[in-house]
Amino acid sequence: MNLLILFFGYLFGSFPSGYLAGRIAKGIDIRSLGSGSTGATNVLRHIGKRAAITVFLLDVFKGVLSILLAKYLLLNDSWQVAVGLSTLIGHIWPVWLNWKGGKAVATGLGIFLGLSWQVGLATLGVFIIMITLFRIVSLASVSASLALPLIMFLSFSGSNLSLPFLIVSLLAMILVIWRHRENIVRLIRGKEPRIGQP
């Protein structure tokens, strides 16, 4: 039964919201444009604000839904984390799109909102602060992912810390940074575009 839930978690994550937005709105394959990601940032740059907001909310919802399902089925912390990871993997490597999906930010946010809404909101707060100051989505995404494990650790006191939650926060951080490796190179070179720039 639990393995079946992991499978459904992957399916939730692999729902190609960004790809469908491109096809429906403009008849394009968003993977062939810009960063090649199916995430909200690439959708914003090549389709528009309304489509990007829709994709962002759908991607967050995928993460939240998978964790809520795991909690509804009374799965323990380890299995909740496993379901979250399967959802994140589905988002990054969707079988329907030849394993080419998003960069794990919005769906990752949804997963952590589901696991611990306080941690999710605090991490979102870091993202909002960085995006407000610098207007560079990748910088905000990487900064929030780096802050995530610390936020997870600080949000629990002593024996209340869930080791699986802490481990998944570290894994999510690694995945987000790895998916943004090209952005990080451009950031170092001072060539990463800000919001509103092509």
From Swiss-Prot:
Superkingdom per UniProt: Bacteria
Membrane topology reported for the UniProt record: Multi-pass membrane protein
Residues spanning the membrane: 1-21, 55-75, 79-99, 111-131, 136-156, 158-178
Enzyme Commission code(s) on record: 2.3.1.275
This protein's pathway: Lipid metabolism; phospholipid metabolism
GO cellular component: plasma membrane
UniProt xrefs under InterPro entries: G3P_acylTferase_PlsY
Coarse class of the protein's main subcellular location: membrane
Subcellular location: Cell inner membrane
Keyword tags: Cell inner membrane, Cell membrane, Lipid biosynthesis, Lipid metabolism, Membrane, Phospholipid biosynthesis, Phospholipid metabolism, Transferase, Transmembrane, Transmembrane helix
Subunit structure, interactors included: Probably interacts with PlsX.
UniProt-listed HAMAP family: PlsY
Sequence similarity: Belongs to the PlsY family.
Protein name: Glycerol-3-phosphate acyltransferase
Organism expressing this protein natively: Prochlorococcus marinus (strain NATL2A)
